[in-house]
Regions:
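Formylglycine-dependent
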Residues: 1-88, 92, 118-143
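Loop/turn elements at helix/coil->beta-strand transitions in domains of secreted/extracellular proteins
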Residues: 54-61, 164-170, 304-305, 319-323
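Beta-strand elements within well-structured catalytic alpha/beta cores of enzymes
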Residues: 46, 59-65, 141, 145-148, ...
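Short, solvent-exposed turn/loop segments enriched in Gly/Ser/Thr/Pro and often Arg
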Residues: 4, 61-71, 113-121, 172-180, ...
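Long, internal low-complexity/basic segments
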Residues: 113-119, 125-134, 268, 331-336, ...
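Histidine-centered active-site microenvironments of extracellular/periplasmic hydrolases
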Residues: 1, 73-74, 157-249, 390-399
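C-terminal cap/loop subdomain of S1 sulfatases and analogous C-terminal strand-loop tails that border
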Residues: 3-7, 211-242, 253-342, 389, ...
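Active-site rim elements
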Residues: 29-37, 86-88, 137-143, 231-235, ...
Length: 432
């Protein structure tokens, strides 16, 4: 479904160029219920699956919500709970979020914010109308998250009512940092997007933001707030793209509050197998079981000499203890590697590669070994994430909308030809 750009209220695709949203159940095409809203309906379906299972047998359930992926949409009562909450704008809110995370002990007091990318707009440069729209978009995002929280709570309440919660380990986490997608651009690109919105029947009025037939996103500036105090957001190798919270509770899990030791996504399966008492060969997994740390038997899943890595379309990172090397490609990065000490600088503001050349080179060599081991293909500028995404979208747009483009070009050509003829006729009359 996600590859075809599904919305939250119906099967209408939001991605330009997508012809239909395809939903499947048990490998077979299916249709949505009439009153579909993504978080509510997906939780309803998960409850049905749990109820249909054998209560005497263990179960594994994976609930992948659309919240808060674009298009951000939420019932109006959730959105209106945040009236005025974001009127101060993203510059103020990013600073507030930094201080709040420090006050709550989520990051060290030495944490500072990386400068916002030059392409980000300053809040004070926006018109009053632009500020109102931007604040409302962030309200929709907050409402969507609260709606998701409510429906996750319904699932947990159901497990508790059926006597299964006390014997169930629950993990709640995100797949990546905040999404920076936007639904308006500058110049001709925006004219083209407005034409697509008109063709597809989107209602982008202020009153309809986040509602049915809307096309709403928070954009890169609010994404920086959502990822703060970390740098950047989804797609990138900075902490804002990679570091997300994970909440886990259940039998055998110590109620220890905030744990700062990292857990890699590849650790999840070994952790679940370990918790369920299922024998497995650790050598067959890239990740480690985090259960010893989660149960309070150890302080961390990785010792200071162990590493783990990520790569997505040229953006990459490798972690070892308190250290991290990272590379971000354009348009937000320059494809150069940098070294950070996350124990004091999780905002990734001070590159320490020149001060620690031996460590830097050793970690680079380890990253290269990782890419060879897992088969990472090094991409060039034409294949960087955003570049490739835009090229693919443009190909789909041309394929889907070429008849409309042809009609438009013929209309423009006809108008120009008519204007030319009228002008020439007028000149002849003046000459005579």
């Amino acid at each position: 479904m996600d590859a075809t750009g599904g919305g939250n209220y119906d099967a209408k695709p939001y991605l330009p160029g997508s012809h239909a949203v395809k939903w499947f159940e048990d490998g077979e095409p299916t249709t949505l219920v009439d009153d579909y809203y993504s978080s509510r309906t997906l939780v309803d379906k998960m409850i049905d699956y749990v109820d249909a299972s054998d209560p005497e047998q263990p179960f594994f359930a994976y609930l992948s919500l659309q919240a808060a992926h674009m298009p951000i949409q939420a019932p109006l009562d959730y959105v209106d709970r945040y009236n005025g909450a974001f009127d101060d704008g993203w510059d103020v809110k990013r600073q507030e979020r930094l201080q709040r995370t420090i006050d709550r002990g989520l990051v060290p007091p030495t944490t500072t914010l990386a400068p916002a990318p030059a392409v980000h707009r300053a809040w004070d440069d926006l018109s009053a109308e632009e500020k109102a729209v931007a604040a409302r978009e962030m309200q929709v995002n907050a409402g969507m998250m609260e709606a998701a929280d409510f429906h996750i709570g319904r699932l947990l309440d159901h497990l508790e009512a059926t006597g299964q919660l006390e014997n169930t380990i629950v993990m709640v986490l995100s797949d990546n940092g905040a999404e920076s997608g936007k639904t308006s651009f500058d110049g001709l690109a925006n004219l083209g997007l407005d034409a697509i919105k008109l063709i597809e029947g989107f209602d982008t009025s202020f009153e309809n933001l986040g509602q049915r037939r809307s096309l709403t996103a928070v954009g890169p500036e609010w994404a920086s707030v959502l990822s703060a105090p970390f740098d950047l957001y989804k797609f990138y190798g900075s902490e804002g793209g990679l570091r997300v919270p994970m909440v886990i509770a259940g039998p055998g899990i110590a109620a220890s509050g905030v744990e700062h030791a990292p857990v890699h996504v590849a650790d999840l399966v070994p952790t679940m197998l370990d918790a369920a008492g299922v024998p497995y060969d650790p050598a067959q997994f890239y990740g480690h079981s985090a259960l010893p740390m989660l149960s309070g038997r150890t302080d961390t899943t990785y010792n200071d000499n162990e590493s783990f890595a990520f790569e997505v379309s040229g953006n990459a990172a490798l972690y070892r203890g308190q250290w991290k090397i990272t590379r971000n490609t354009p348009p937000r990065g320059d494809a150069e590697w940098r070294l950070y000490d996350l124990s004091v600088d999780p905002g990734e503001t001070t590159d320490l590669s020149a001060a620690n050349p031996a460590l830097f080179e050793d970690m680079l060599a380890e990253y290269r070994a990782y890419t060879e081991n897992v088969g990472v293909f090094e991409v060039g500028p034409d294949d960087y994430a955003i570049t490739a995404l835009n090229k693919n979208l443009m190909t789909k747009v041309i394929h889907k909308y070429w008849p409309h483009m042809l009609v438009f070009l013929l209309a423009v050509g006809g108008a120009l030809f008519f204007a030319f003829k009228m002008g020439r006729t007028a000149l002849r009359r003046r000459a005579s």
